[in-house]
């Protein structure tokens, strides 16, 4: 965190005396300069630092040299007082008498103004970097393009009244990771990481140094340095803090703006002064705009604005139908009753769930049935040729099971004891022989509708319900306006505050999947503007209006300025002839180097190059969980790397023994002796206390009775075996990770167009060649990247992290957000926990699993000779230190930072009429998977032939154009197999696995009356004008501008006829 150096009283006294003499000399020199007339202030960078520390009125106390505009290394110490005195003034200044000794105090500096230091609000401080931000500390401004040092150490001071006369010196530095600081709004980039220099200070000093404090007591100046003084309390103890400030201010000295000149053209006319006073064109345009807004507001207030069209849905009974409605309300619609849920469908001779049988686009909506009271006819919907059709069945017998009837309208529920239908599929046949193929389910719009369906038969007829109509009304003739529903079609889905709307419903605003409906003038104006002024319309207006306005301005300026004849001649007679393209050819090119195609000239992808701005982020060594051990056919007396040198390797054992959080265990397996000797079991119980008493060791000694001792074989009467294991977290010398930051990344595509080399990027996707212009649809660049170059025992590989790391969010503990060293000698992260060792037999079922985090399993292995055994060691993950380990890098990075989503699109424009070659050979290995006449696109894949683009057709229907090579697309199929595929010439048969629509289809059932309404297709001129009012308005404006332009040109030609056509 920081380094502390206690200062003694004697050192402090000497420093204060030397500083006092220097400051007095500076004050005397400054006072003598103030008496003389001051030269005008310059903007030079060499004098900006001296002037910034002085005020214009009177000999005020000096606030220090802020050094604005200077490009010095602010980590260096200032020059001695003698050099400063000689450089400032050559006149001798009498030295004041020495000040008497004073009690210990902070370094004497000249006070300035007080105030509050602004600082960014980045939340509560969780690390030293955020704590520095919280207390207003800012890094020095650094330009990454210059050859300036990336690190600079500065010194701050910290002392407390409770600590006596001890002053703590805090050294810290800022590291620039290569991004430009954002100093326009007073903030700085979070990528500038804050890192203190030196070892860890005492805990209470760190807590006091990182304590946020916003109040600034004063600004101190010491030579060429500037400090901010703060005092605060931590746990009842008052602390003082002097923070070093940047040498250059955040605002800086900006250059003056260049002079601006405005040229005014006189437009007054002595003959027609009213044109200037009243502004007739402006009045006309304003009136036209108000008229358009009024028309749009009126149209939006009388009818809803719909953005999407609703598909057909079950029809509804008339609102005055049935005697059951006479008891409640004559305008209530008849709602469906509860039916069966789940949807069991009959497919062939079997019943299956709807979710297993339904086509894809039907699963996106609801499916089911309405149960209505009148059973004179039933209705269902069929789907074929990607359209919905209504089917009607007449004379359906009524049910015999009475159930309560429920109606709901305007949040009113009532039950009527009447004869009600049974579940919706009751009374239907289980099989249907001659039904129409291609039937599908119906989709309901409201969550309150029941969902059920079954395969039935019916006549194929088309039907359409009357449309929904609205009106506007007011309560008691006063605002606000309300929307009243005149007729409602339930499948439109209009709701008021979540409740379905019915005829007679009044609501301020209605909402449906089709749009919004309102009578409020403000809402109507917004709806009219949002629906009429779309992005396409705005672009069309700009494209149509801006060129005419520019030409009008050019002609008007040419008529009123000198040199009008030459300007108008250049515009009218010469003009500008844009290049005339004979033909545009479009094709695709794969993204692998070496791919080629015809456009119609040959185009080949020579290579792909990756460019970026690289900033070195340092190098670190990850923690490595390393373990070793040995299986010994006796009981050793010296359990250490030296005592077990014959069984364990010396170098790894020493590295592990000297590692961090060492764990070592010595197991005595079934330790006993026979043939008259005493039992050795108690020699290792409890916890090997007797063994450690005679053989001191730093490892744990544990008995392992019951474990297999077959590894040491050949001694049927006397078997002694022991296992030693050692594990710890170490810094492996051959495992390092180097971090590099890639900013301003760009992908360069190297193309060869008819032998001419060309490079295209996202910024410049064009190639201008002698044969024509080639426009390339280039994928977007990957953005900022972080490269981890991992070197593990000679095997080097790179991993890439997408985007910049969020070091103040979830990535605060990642390796990239830590401070690294150039020589890879620094371990990343906190010290891991101690690993756990475990002895496991070879036949233990535990070996079927993997060791847990921080666990090491050791298993004895039978040797090839007597009294020879080995050891199998399995180490698990790194425990809680995984975030600093290679596993974290693999989990948060990728091996390929950039992969294009598809082929490159090539648009070739040539000045000569050409014909793009088309492939005539049939495609190969074409497979069709899915269904036909079901509304779901089928999957079509295969290989397109060479020789040009393949315009693929399936049974005569166009599917799309594909470059040579493999293609995968989706297409709606209307014909059954077999499928003939072609590229425009010879055809071939494709293999197909499609679903039979007859076995796939089913119907949703609707019981009740059926109302048929045929919509008229005639349209009056007034209706057409109301539907195209925006286009008419835009056309009228363009016509007026064109008329004004022609009049202006005619007037200019009349006055300049002598210059254009002299007699």
UniProtKB/Swiss-Prot annotation:
Tree of life domain: Viruses
Keyword Disulfide bond: yes
Xref: Gene3D superfamilies: Rubella membrane glycoprotein E1, domain 1, Rubella membrane glycoprotein E1, domain 2, Rubella membrane glycoprotein E1, domain 3, Rubella virus capsid protein
Compositionally biased tracts (Basic residues): 59-69
InterPro entries referenced in this protein's UniProt entry, alphabetically: Rubella_Capsid, Rubella_Capsid_sf, Rubella_E1, Rubella_E1_1, Rubella_E1_2, Rubella_E1_3, Rubella_E2
Feature type site, description Cleavage: 300-301, 582-583
Region spans: Human C1QBP/SF2P32-binding: 30-69
UniProt binding sites for Ca(2+): 670-671, 718-719
Statement: the UniProt record of this protein carries the keyword Calcium: yes
Region of interest called Functions as E1 signal peptide, as start-end residue ranges on this chain: 562-582
Keywords: Calcium, Capsid protein, Clathrin-mediated endocytosis of virus by host, Disulfide bond, Fusion of virus membrane with host endosomal membrane, Fusion of virus membrane with host membrane, Glycoprotein, Host cytoplasm, Host Golgi apparatus, Host membrane, Host mitochondrion, Host-virus interaction, Lipoprotein, Membrane, Metal-binding, Palmitate, Phosphoprotein, RNA-binding, T=4 icosahedral capsid protein, Transmembrane, Transmembrane helix, Viral attachment to host cell, Viral envelope protein, Viral penetration into host cytoplasm, Virion, Virus endocytosis by host, Virus entry into host cell
PTM comment text: Structural polyprotein: Specific enzymatic cleavages in vivo yield mature proteins. Two signal peptidase-mediated cleavages within the polyprotein produce the structural proteins capsid, E2, and E1. The E2 signal peptide remains attached to the C-terminus of the capsid protein after cleavage by the signal peptidase. Another signal peptide at E2 C-terminus directs E1 to the ER, with a similar mechanism. Capsid is phosphorylated on Ser-46 by host. This phosphorylation negatively regulates capsid protein RNA-binding activity. Dephosphorylated by human PP1A.
Residues recorded with modification Phosphoserine: 46
Written domain comment of the UniProt record: Structural polyprotein: Contains two internal signal peptides that are necessary for directing translocation of the glycoproteins into the lumen of the endoplasmic reticulum.
Protein name (database record): Structural polyprotein
């Amino acid at each position: 965190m920081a380094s502390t150096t206690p200062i003694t009283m004697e050192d402090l006294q000497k420093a204060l005396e030397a500083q006092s003499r220097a400051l007095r000399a500076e004050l005397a020199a400054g006072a003598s300069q103030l008496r003389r007339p001051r030269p005008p202030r310059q903007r030079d960078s060499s004098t900006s630092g001296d002037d910034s520390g002085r005020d214009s009125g009177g000999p005020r106390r000096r606030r220090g040299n802020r050094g604005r505009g200077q490009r010095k290394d602010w980590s260096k110490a200032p020059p001695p007082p003698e050099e400063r005195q000689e450089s400032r003034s050559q006149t001798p200044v009498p030295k004041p008498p020495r000040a008497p000794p004073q009690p210990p105090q902070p370094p004497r500096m000249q006070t300035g103004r007080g105030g509050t230091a602004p600082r960014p609000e980045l939340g509560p401080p969780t690390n030293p970097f955020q704590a520095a931000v919280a207390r207003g500390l800012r890094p020095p401004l650094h330009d990454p393009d210059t050859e300036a040092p990336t690190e600079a150490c500065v010194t701050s001071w910290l002392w407390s009244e409770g600590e006596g006369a001890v002053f703590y010196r805090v050294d810290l530095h800022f590291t620039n990771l290569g991004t430009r600081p954002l100093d326009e709004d007073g903030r700085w980039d979070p990528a500038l990481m804050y890192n203190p220099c030196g070892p860890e200070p005492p805990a209470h000093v760190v807590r006091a140094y990182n304590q946020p404090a916003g109040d600034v007591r004063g600004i101190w100046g010491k030579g060429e340095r500037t400090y901010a003084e703060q005092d605060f309390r931590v746990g009842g103890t008052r602390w003082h803090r002097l923070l070093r400030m940047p040498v250059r201010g955040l605002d800086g000295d900006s250059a003056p703006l260049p002079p601006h000149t405005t040229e005014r053209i006189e437009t007054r006319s002595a003959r027609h002064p009213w044109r200037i006073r009243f502004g007739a064109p402006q009045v006309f345009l304003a009136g036209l705009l108000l008229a358009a807004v009024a028309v749009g507001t009126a149209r939006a207030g009388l009818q809803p604005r719909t953005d999407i069209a609703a598909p057909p849905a079950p029809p509804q009974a008339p609102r005055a139908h049935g005697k059951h409605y006479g008891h409640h309300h004559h305008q209530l619609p008849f709602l469906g009753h509860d039916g069966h849920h789940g949807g069991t469908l009959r497919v062939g001779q079997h019943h299956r769930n709807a979710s297993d049988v339904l086509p894809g686009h039907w699963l996106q909506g609801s499916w089911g049935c309405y149960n209505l009271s009148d059973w004179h006819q039933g209705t269902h919907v069929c789907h074929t040729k990607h359209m919905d059709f209504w089917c009607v069945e007449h004379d359906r017998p009524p049910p015999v099971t009475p159930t309560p009837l429920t109606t709901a309208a305007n949040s009113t529920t009532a039950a009527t004891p009447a004869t009600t239908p049974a579940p919706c599929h009751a009374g239907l046949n289980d099989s249907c022989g001659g039904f129409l193929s291609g039937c599908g389910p119906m989709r309901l719009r409201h969550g309150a509708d029941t969902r059920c369906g079954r395969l039935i038969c019916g006549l194929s007829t088309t039907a359409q319900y009357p449309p929904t109509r609205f009106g506007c009304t007011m309560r008691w003739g006063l605002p606000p306006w309300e929307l009243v529903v005149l007729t409602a079609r339930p499948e439109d889905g209009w709701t008021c505050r979540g409740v379905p709307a019915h005829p007679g419903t009044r609501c301020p605003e209605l909402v449906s999947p089709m749009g919004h409906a309102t009578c409020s003038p403000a809402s109507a104006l917004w709806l009219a503007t949002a629906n009429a002024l779309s992005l396409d319309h705005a672009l069309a207006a700009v494209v149509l209006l801006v060129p005419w306005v520019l030409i009008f301005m050019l002609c008007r300026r040419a008529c009123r300025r000198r040199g009008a004849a030459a300007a108008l001649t250049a515009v009218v007679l010469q003009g500008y002839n844009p290049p005339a393209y004979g033909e545009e050819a479009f094709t695709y090119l794969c993204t692998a180097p070496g791919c080629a195609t015809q456009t119609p000239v040959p185009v080949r992808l020579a290579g792909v190059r990756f460019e970026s701005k690289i900033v070195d982020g340092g190098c670190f060594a990850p923690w490595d969980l390393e373990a070793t051990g040995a299986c010994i056919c006796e009981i050793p007396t010296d359990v250490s790397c030296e005592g077990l040198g014959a069984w364990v390797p010396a170098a790894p054992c020493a590295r592990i023994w000297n590692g961090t959080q060492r764990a070592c265990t010595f197991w005595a397996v079934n330790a006993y002796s026979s043939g008259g000797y005493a039992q050795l079991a108690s020699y290792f119980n409890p916890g090997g206390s007797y063994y450690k008493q005679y053989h001191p060791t730093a490892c744990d000694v544990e008995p392992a009775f019951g474990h297999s001792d077959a590894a040491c074989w050949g001694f049927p009467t006397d078997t002694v075996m022991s296992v030693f294991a050692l594990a710890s977290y170490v810094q492996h010398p051959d495992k390092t990770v180097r971090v590099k930051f890639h900013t301003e990344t760009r992908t360069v595509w190297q193309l060869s167009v008819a032998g001419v080399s060309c490079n295209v990027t996202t910024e410049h996707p064009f190639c201008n060649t002698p044969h024509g212009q080639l426009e390339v649809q280039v994928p977007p660049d990957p953005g900022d990247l972080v490269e981890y170059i991992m070197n593990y025992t000679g095997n080097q590989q790179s991993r890439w992290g997408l985007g910049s790391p969020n070091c103040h969010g979830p990535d605060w503990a990642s390796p990239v957000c830590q401070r690294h060293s150039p020589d890879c000698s620094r371990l990343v992260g906190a010290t891991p926990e101690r690993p756990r060792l475990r002895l496991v037999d070879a036949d233990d079922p535990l070996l079927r699993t993997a060791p847990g985090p921080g666990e090491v399993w050791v298993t004895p292995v039978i040797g090839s000779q007597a009294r020879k055994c080995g050891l199998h060691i399995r180490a698990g993950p790194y425990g809680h230190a995984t975030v600093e380990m290679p596993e974290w890098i693999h989990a948060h990075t990728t091996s390929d930072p950039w992969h294009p989503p598809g082929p490159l699109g090539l648009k070739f424009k040539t000045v000569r009429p050409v014909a793009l070659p088309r492939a005539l050979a049939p495609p190969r290995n074409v497979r069709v998977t899915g269904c036909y006449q079901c509304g779901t696109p089928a999957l079509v894949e295969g290989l397109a032939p060479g020789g040009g683009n393949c315009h693929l057709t399936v049974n005569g229907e166009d599917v799309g154009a594909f470059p040579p090579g493999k293609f995968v697309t989706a297409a709606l199929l209307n014909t059954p197999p077999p499928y003939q595929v072609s590229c425009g010439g010879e055809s071939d048969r494709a293999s197909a696995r499609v679903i039979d629509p007859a076995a796939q289809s089913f119907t949703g059932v609707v019981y009740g009356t059926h109302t048929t309404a045929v919509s008229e297709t005639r349209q009056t001129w007034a209706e057409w004008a109301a539907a195209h009012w925006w286009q008419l308005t835009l056309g009228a404006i363009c016509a007026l501008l064109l008329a004004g332009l022609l009049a202006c040109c005619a007037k200019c030609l009349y006055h300049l006829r002598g210059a254009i056509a002299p007699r």
